């Protein structure tokens, strides 16, 4: 029995039996203060029946995608300007998520888990060539196609089979209190490519096999 006593929000990892691959991760977050309304006018619920890809371009500006508790398969999820993705506590979203090029003011948050939909490093028929990684912010090497002002907060990224979080032409972004746990080879934690600038990362934890 392992008992952990915590008197404030903390991220604690216990290394067991002197083995880097045997760890117990304890993520004790503060209480949520920014829980969105699941019944909001522009809220789209992702529930147990969700199994199709989601293209934010099919939804209006201001849409909130609300992932309810439970396990949900959404092979790929594309976010556009002024959209939000909320992953509730107890929710596991099996997906790959991208904020598209030229988009801005996007928020990804919640206390749930984003887990890689791909079960191998190779791409499968449920992804396309633009969803290479678990979470991608931006999608262009072109300086004129920058993704801006994206916030990623509080979520857990689990079991990526490729790079974990990739910034590809992203600027003025914030990553706060994000936890990444990976065991696959070459699951880089943060990758900064293209014209990526002014990225702030705070209070975050990485257990990956690179970077």
Give a label for each model feature.
Residues 1-211:
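Extracellular/periplasmic carbohydrate-active domains that bind, remodel
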């Amino acid at each position: 029995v392992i008992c952990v006593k915590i008197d404030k929000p903390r991220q604690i990892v216990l290394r067991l039996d002197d083995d880097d691959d045997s760890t117990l991760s304890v993520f004790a977050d503060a209480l949520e203060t920014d829980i969105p309304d699941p019944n909001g006018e522009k809220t789209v619920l992702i529930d147990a029946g969700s199994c199709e890809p989601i293209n934010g371009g099919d939804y209006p500006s201001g849409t909130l995608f609300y992932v309810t508790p439970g396990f949900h398969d959404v092979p790929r999820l594309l976010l556009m300007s002024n959209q939000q993705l909320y992953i509730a506590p107890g929710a596991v979203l099996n997906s790959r998520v991208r904020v598209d090029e030229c988009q801005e003011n996007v928020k990804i948050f919640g206390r749930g888990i984003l887990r890689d939909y791909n079960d191998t490093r190779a791409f499968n028929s449920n992804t396309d060539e633009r969803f290479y990684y678990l979470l991608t912010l931006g999608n262009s090497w072109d300086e004129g196609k920058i993704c801006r002002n994206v916030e990623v907060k509080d979520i857990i990224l689990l079991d990526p089979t490729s790079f974990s979080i990739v910034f590809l032409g992203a600027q003025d972004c914030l990553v706060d209190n994000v936890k990444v746990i990976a065991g696959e080879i070459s699951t880089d934690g943060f990758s900064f490519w293209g014209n990526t600038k002014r990225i702030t990362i705070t209070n975050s934890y990485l257990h990956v096999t690179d970077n």
